[in-house]
Amino acid sequence: NAHTAVPACEPSRCALMSGRRPWVSGCYKNGHEWRKYQKPGEGLSAQFLKAGYYVSGAGKIYHQMDALEEEWSDYMDKGKLSSNGPGVDKYDGYHIEKTFPHLKDEDIVDWHSVDYCVERLSKKRKKPYFIACGLYKPHLAFVAPRKYYKDFPLDEIKLPPHIENDLDDVPPPGIKMAGPQADHAKFLKSGRWKAAIQSYLATCAYTDMNVGRLLDAFEKSPDRKNTIIVFWSDHGWSLGEKQHWRKFALWEETTRIPMIWVA
């Protein structure tokens, strides 16, 4: 029953990597400013580096796949790889993001992040090593190759528990947090609530596949018997419970996270 320090990408990751709670560091929001709250040399990877480890990283460890280069032995350059696959992105100064259909596994940056880490897991090293592999999905946008949708037929999708008056006993700040007139109102109007859940599950399945690739590489690793695995996420997700979507709330759906240790 693990819960994040704060249900938002940037402050949650800053808390984990710095070991400092948001109310200590001051990092509460997404704003691409986590460097203001975490000094160079304070991060988790920096601690491993100081302890003599070889430290590799790929993907979304900090917010927006950012990293402090001096805190890593090597870190994957994502180049022009996209978290959502090829599409229309920031055309002529405008942020108009639309993903092209018929994606392949390798069209999404997570595939390449796993490739990067798999290659490093295969090497026998003279010094201990730490590898951080940050998978972007199932973050928005909910896009994945179509084959991952087949296990989630639209007519079998079940909506989460919900009642129309669920916010009647919630004070104004809580209603503002839920935002029933934002995402939820749009899904009710469009009739695509189940389609959104289906797409979310498909991105989860895509991530499950990539985690499997990492575990397969771990099984073949020369250091398999002397390796600790930690599986963690930065926040939970709401899919319409209490008329709320996304994270940014203090209900269990948004704060609860997976936390698995294998040693």
Language-model features: where?
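Formylglycine-dependent sulfatase
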Residues: 1-263
